[in-house]
Design a protein with these regions (language model features):
Chain B
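Linear, non-domain "peripheral" regions
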Residues: 1-119, 125
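Conserved structured core elements
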Residues: 3, 168-169
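Short capping/connector residues at structural and topological boundaries
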Residues: 18, 70, 106-107, 165-166, ...
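Glycine-rich, small/acidic residue-mixed loop/short-helix segments
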Residues: 24-34, 39-41, 231-252, 256-261, ...
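Secondary-structure boundary elements
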Residues: 80-84, 89, 96-166, 174-176, ...
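Hydrophobic/aromatic-rich core segments of domains that either
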Residues: 170-260
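Intrinsically disordered, low-complexity linkers and terminal tails enriched in Pro/Gly
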Residues: 194-200, 276-283
């Protein structure tokens, strides 16, 4: 594997300018002080109950995501490039989804193959020909970014359904402010705490009708959902009700919530519930988590769902490989942020290449997420590769492959002190009817194990505070 | 032919239920083979009925039963004028290109057994229409049509094949699943079947009743063609088409978060003697 | 506010209050069980603990006849048993689950108390506790409810969320006091008066202790412990925070606050006020004359009815 780019130290041992102050500070603070602060951070996290559940793990129903106290630093210029590219990407995603559910120009022009849409489980026939309020579909996007050298940021993945992690972005900053006020006095760090206001403004701008103050609610699957903490955290930050399906009902195509003062109309639902569970009259009929009749209110234009139903048609890994073409098709622009080169195993010549190069590639399931069901060639032994090969051959259309990127590393506190670990970045892009809002930075995820490239929290990844320097 | 139809559904709820949302898909649309002369929906509950179109262009009504109540009863009743088009459909409401109907669903999953069955019926030459007929014949020989709940919860394609017998809905699942595997768009149809011989109709189809599921498949040059593999024939003037979707779940005449459902369905030749083909099903 | 949120708050405070009451019952039973029989100690103190907690059927199904109830069984059943839906452990579990569901309606201080208590609960061993450990455990439970009440009182906005939370606690508290009286009413009855020996004193004192009112009794009545005064303190005395009258004074006020905030009142306000009036207008002689037992049974049933009315009116 090629040598990874470290965001703090250049190969010649010099420190990159943005990290100079941090590096000096790290060198000056004794290890035991850092250890102590790290323990303090963990204590605070547990105390306020920021936990998540790991699927398939018994007795570990509530676990902490490791928090790394060394911040990641991004310069103002780097952020400028990133945010323009993110805005472009999300704009194209929205236009693509709107098109797929209406005129299908993109299919007629042959930019995206028809079966990738129609045979896609995330495509919702129910959304066909339905206008959504303000023609926007992806109001809250999380775009995963990786970096390989000083100048190259790749988009690794688009999350257009219900991206999570923003609560960590906000809590990480709060904890850093509490534990290391001196560090903030040495840097000009762009604040992130406006996210709550931005999100509320975005959601309100999406209400189907003008006139009255829109009633916004967050719909959660409930306390057993792995991201429940985030749901309640956001409700708190926004000052809106956190509802479950049973708190809502639909009458004459209008959604109401049950309150102590009787039914109250709901205009915008930020739902953290998958499409399949939203409405048992339309989707899975065994869903206890949804609201019977919700889709009829949605189709009647009386409620906004964020994100819209059916956005998954834009964010699976097979569609991902077409994103550069999609951007060109709708915007007539070159993508500002490149894609990672991707082989689609559904195409025979791609599959052939992938099968011949398995030990050096990363192979992912088209609909997988959370780092499950993937093969990291260079990190796997022969038996694992052969086992995966069998899976791949049995159902090639279900996989894509990418070169194993040398993800950039950042200084990270590990047992033996500070050492480089691989990171990625998930910025959150809010698209309202009035404008696009992006809080500087995002959630940096870090693979805590030496050499590991898998940053997902379900696979033992941790998080860091992400600093965008204002000067 | 003029066919009179009556379809009654009783949906049970937990006693004392309030604000129960219900969707009914009980209003047929006209096309070249059928013309809706009159059609009414009648509920035992006061609510606003506004028609919406679902994804596939079916007319449906979603409403809310205020309650408190323990049941809802819906009666759809009407009269339809039909004519024979040798199974070829014209003038139907189409919201998607045919290729959408290659989509798999849980009920029409191409399991290895379904794939093997479809491959067994594969023709060597490129003849979509011949292929569909061959598939119908193979299916008719493999799966025996069973009397029983036509509108209840039909078996999946795989389960119908495993059991070797299924009601019309299960047979339609297997037909669509196999056709899709062979690259031919296919879809699930719900509707009504009037007795062919008004004198004998009742005796011949005792228990199967007037509610029926079948399939439509797409053959280039012809368009959509109806296939009733259970009876080994293409649609005739005795068929009234109610709804179209990817599987039985999509054409369900009533959906709610309630308990069990009871149905009574009758269709009869309204010019001939008043003989009913009547079905009762429960699920 | 969301009905479900109000419901969760209401039950959250009920469960914390119930845990507190169970801890007091166990405390008093333990104390009485050390006391020699001649001084009012009795062999069936543990049985009456089960009766007071209102889980007789479940207990008997598990451990056999109530008369033979053994200390270790009762302690483990009331304090820790996962099978007993109202064990202290389960009360805390449910309270925390409810708290998680309504975190946005709680202040961080309230959440902190519940969450910390739940974490600390895991540190108590899953075996029979020594007497020392049990005392520490009971002290921890009582302290948790104190901290929770304190956090509620000091940090919550005075709005409908607060009133629902307080209503739950008051309703539960009234129920608990009434149950203690219901199980022990016989030692308060006049027929026993002539005994007047040390045996009765310890029984009366233990009733007062179970509601933390032994000291208060002396301040209020400046008299030796007498059964009708014990009953008066627990039923009618509005100075005594655990008395039925005090609970209903608070409860009626909370429900009225809700009604005036919403601009609408209903059956729960009417029932609460009528019960409050009943407690204000009676004297203790009156109650004894008409039958203490009947009075208490009727109270418990009306109190339950009020719970049902609140649920119907606001929480569903």
């Amino acid at each position: 594997m090629p040598h990874a780019f470290d965001e703090m130290s250049s190969t010649d041992g010099s420190v990159r300018p943005a990290y100079e102050t941090l590096q000096r500070w790290l060198a000056s603070v004794p290890q035991d002080v850092l250890d102590h602060r790290r323990k303090e951070a963990e204590f605070i996290f547990r105390r306020i109950g920021i936990t998540f559940a790991v699927y398939g793990e018994q007795n570990a129903q509530e676990r902490l995501i490791p928090f790394d106290i060394v911040p990641r630093i991004i310069t103002k210029d780097e952020w400028g490039t990133l945010s323009k590219g993110l805005e472009q990407r999300v704009k194209a995603l929205n236009m693509y989804i709107a098109d797929v559910y209406a005129k299908r120009e993109v299919l007629k022009a042959g930019v995206v193959p028809e079966n990738l849409v129609y045979q896609n489980p995330a495509f919702r026939p129910e959304m066909n020909g339905q206008r959504v309020p303000h023609d926007l579909y992806v109001h809250i996007a999380g775009i995963d970014i990786v970096r390989t050298d000083p100048d190259t940021f790749y988009v690794l993945e688009d999350n257009a359904r219900t991206p999570s992690g923003v609560s960590y972005m906000l809590e990480n900053r709060e904890i850093m402010l509490r534990l290391f006020p001196e560090l903030f006095s040495m840097h000009k760090v762009a604040p992130v705490d406006k996210y709550g206001d931005d999100l509320l403004a975005t959601l309100r701008s999406l209400a189907p009708h003008g006139g009255h103050e829109p009633n916004v609610a967050i719909l959660t699957p409930g306390i057993y959902n792995s991201a429940y903490y985030e749901h309640s955290f956001l409700a708190d930050k926004l000052g809106v009700d956190l509802v479950e399906g049973r708190d809502l009902f639909v009458k004459d195509a209008v959604v109401y919530m049950r309150t102590t003062e009787g039914p109250k109309r709901v205009d915008v639902i930020y739902r953290r519930l998958d499409d399949d569970f939203l409405d048992p009259l339309v989707f899975r009929r065994d869903s206890q988590l949804g609201v019977p009749g919700l889709m009829s209110a949605y189709h009647a234009g009386n409620v906004t769902l964020t994100n819209a139903v059916g956005t998954g048609v834009a964010d699976d890994k097979a569609v991902y490989s077409y994103m550069p073409d999609i951007i060109r098709f709708y915007l007539g622009e070159e993508p500002l942020l490149p894609n990672v080169p991707t082989w689609r195993c559904r195409e025979p010549d791609h599959l052939k290449y992938v099968l011949e190069h398995l030990p050096e590639l990363v192979v992912k399931e088209v609909h997988g997420s959370g780092g499950y069901g993937m093969l990291v060639g260079p990190a796997s032994d022969k038996a694992q590769i052969e086992k995966f090969r069998a899976k791949l051959v049995a159902d090639p259309a279900n996989f894509i492959a990418q070169p194993t990127l040398a993800l950039s590393t950042c200084p990270t506190m590990v047992e033996k002190g500070v050492a480089p670990r691989h990171v990625d970045l998930r910025p959150f892009i809010l698209s309202g009817s009035d404008k696009v809002r992006i809080v500087p930075g995002g959630l940096t995820r870090v693979a805590m194990k030496e050499g590991s490239l898998v940053v997902n929290s379900s696979q033992g990844g941790g998080t860091k505070d992400t600093w965008v320097l204002d000067a | 032919m003029r066919i009179r139809i009556r379809h009654e559904i009783t949906q049970r709820f937990d006693p004392g239920s309030r604000n129960m949302a219900v969707t009914v898909r009980l209003t047929p649309r006209s096309h070249e083979g059928q013309f809706i002369l009159r059609w009414t929906l009648d509920l035992n509950s006061d609510c606003r009925l506004a028609a919406q179109e679902d994804a596939f262009g079916n007319l449906c009504h979603t409403f809310s039963v205020d309650g408190p109540t323990d049941h809802l009863s819906v009666v759809a009743e009407g009269e339809v004028e039909t004519q024979d088009t040798t199974g070829v459909m014209h003038g139907t409401v189409e919201r998607f290109p045919p290729s959408l109907f290659l989509r798999q669903t849980d009920l029409t999953e191409a399991t290895p057994a379904v794939v093997a069955f479809a491959e067994g019926a594969r023709l060597t030459e490129d003849d979509p229409l011949g292929q569909l007929h061959a598939l119908m014949v193979a299916l008719h020989e493999t799966v025996e049509e069973q009397e029983g709940p036509a509108l209840g919860g039909p078996l999946s394609a795989h389960a119908a094949l495993e059991a070797g017998k299924a009601c019309s809905g299960g047979i339609a699942h297997l037909f669509t699943a196999a056709a899709r595997h062979l690259g031919l768009p296919a879809r699930h149809i719900s509707g009504y079947l009037a007795p062919e011989d008004p004198e004998e109709g009742e005796a011949k189809r005792e228990g199967v009743g007037a509610a029926r599921h079948w399939a439509e498949a797409y053959a280039p040059k012809y368009g959509w063609i109806s296939f009733d593999a259970g009876r080994n024939l293409c649609g005739t003037e005795h068929y009234v088409r109610l709804a179209v979707a990817l599987d039985a779940m999509g054409v369900a005449p009533l959906r709610s978060a309630g308990l069990e459902v009871e149905e009574q369905v009758s269709a009869l030749d309204s010019r001939g003697p008043q003989k009913l083909a009547q079905a009762q099903s429960q699920n | 506010m969301l009905s479900r949120t109000a419901d969760n708050l209401y039950w959250l405070t009920r469960y914390v209050e119930r845990a507190d009451c169970l801890a007091r019952i166990l405390d008093v039973s333990q104390r009485l069980s050390y006391t020699p029989v001649t001084y009012g100690g009795s062999t069936n103190e543990w049985a009456s603990a089960v009766l007071t907690a209102g889980c007789e059927d479940e207990f008997v199904a598990r451990y056999g006849p109530l008369e033979d109830a053994k200390e270790e069984d009762v302690v483990s059943f009331l304090a820790f048993s996962p099978e007993n839906s109202s064990s202290i452990r389960n009360c805390f579990e449910v309270a925390r689950t409810n708290a998680r569901s309504v975190r946005t309606a709680l202040t961080s201080e309230m959440w902190d108390v519940i969450n910390s208590a739940w974490i600390e609960l895991q540190s108590f061993p899953n075996r029979a506790l020594t007497r020392d450990e049990l005392s520490r455990f009971l002290a921890f439970v009582k302290e948790t409810s104190l901290r929770f009440d304190g956090a509620t009182f000091r940090t919550m906005l005075r709005n409908d969320a607060y009133w629902f939370a307080r209503s739950g606690a008051q309703l539960e508290r009234a129920d608990n006091t009434a149950r203690i009286l219901d199980v022990k009413y016989h030692v308060l009855l006049p027929e026993k008066e002539h005994v007047g020996g040390p045996l009765d004193y310890f029984q009366w004192a233990s009733i007062l202790r179970s509601v933390s009112a032994l000291t208060a009794f002396h301040w209020v009545y400046r008299d030796s412990v007498k059964p009708w005064l014990v009953a008066d303190l627990l039923i009618l005395n509005r100075q005594m925070p655990r008395s039925l009258a005090a609970c209903y004074e608070q409860l009626a006020r909370n429900l009225d606050d809700i009604a005036s905030a919403y601009g609408r009142q209903g059956p729960s306000q009417r029932l609460a006020r009528s019960m409050q009036a009943r407690l204000t207008n009676r004297t203790i002689d009156d109650i004894f004359q008409h039958g203490l037992h009947e009075f208490i049974s009727e109270f418990i049933s009306d109190n339950n009815k009020l719970g049902a009315e609140i649920t119907e009116q606001y929480l569903t």
